[in-house]
UniProtKB/Swiss-Prot annotation:
PANTHER family linked to this entry: NUCLEOTIDE KINASE
Region described as NMP: spans on this chain: 31-60
Protein residues bound to AMP: 32, 37, 58-60, 86-89, 93, 134, 145
GO process annotations (BP): AMP salvage
Keywords associated with the record: ATP-binding, Cytoplasm, Kinase, Nucleotide biosynthesis, Nucleotide-binding, Transferase
Domain characteristics, as noted in the entry: Consists of three domains, a large central CORE domain and two small peripheral domains, NMPbind and LID, which undergo movements during catalysis. The LID domain closes over the site of phosphoryl transfer upon ATP binding. Assembling and dissambling the active center during each catalytic cycle provides an effective means to prevent ATP hydrolysis.
GO molecular function: adenylate kinase activity; ATP binding
Transmembrane segments: none
Function according to Swiss-Prot or TrEMBL: Catalyzes the reversible transfer of the terminal phosphate group between ATP and AMP. Plays an important role in cellular energy homeostasis and in adenine nucleotide metabolism.
Gene3D superfamilies according to UniProt: P-loop containing nucleotide triphosphate hydrolases
Protein name: Adenylate kinase
Catalytic activity field: AMP + ATP = 2 ADP
Keyword Kinase: yes
Gene designation: adk
Amino acid sequence: MKRLIFMGPPGAGKGTQADIIKEKYNIPQISTGDILRAAVKNGTAMGIEAKKYMDAGDLVPDAVVIGIIRDRLVEADCANGFILDGFPRTVEQAKALSEILKELHMELDSVVNLDVPDEELVKRLLGRAIKEGRSDDNEETIKNRLHTYNTKTLPLIDFYKATGILRQINGLGSMEEITNTILKSI
């Protein structure tokens, strides 16, 4: 059983690595964006609430996101573990997640943080933007995303370091090397 969080800045390879690890352990990869869209599509109470904000182009408030995460964690496929990808993004969300897990009699096993230098992230994201034809992902936008990550999400590293479950992973190297490092650490 593996209950994991994958963290790291945009372009670090969280989604790619989470995809590989979820197959190995046969556990769901839970992406905040995906479950928000699914909750809206399924017309759940939290989904209806989230839709109001999404339709207005606003950020969905923590209370709604946390409610949707809680609803997702009680589903049967999470009984043997899960990977949270893109959540939590703030210390407040991490504290709320701890409360949810306590309430559900669950504990996190590891928080995997993929560490990649900003210059490499910019290079990767610009390459991905060109490959996927995303003209809105220019260098300035990317640097803004990294700045937001560094100010809002980076404090989570200290939060999880204090719990003893943080696994710092060098995000440079081949996909296989990074996967093997993650597997050894969790």
